[in-house]
């Protein structure tokens, strides 16, 4: 499947959650491979507590085959760990030019 694998993961999670999601690399690896604060940003629109919304997103994320683990942190951050298979696929899509690797 062509395109940015991280963007595809964000779109897949966003489609499952019914909202646009941006994934970022956390500065601390203990916070997962990717993280999002979408629950904190959109809680007022959904009229729900951020932590409750993040817990629902974590359930949806955990159902995706690319996600090995999803957990809520702090007031409503969502931390994601991707599967080794997804990571291998993502690394395989990196274009390295004419190098023979």
Report the location of each language-model feature.
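N-terminal alpha-helical targeting/anchoring segments
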Residues: 1-98
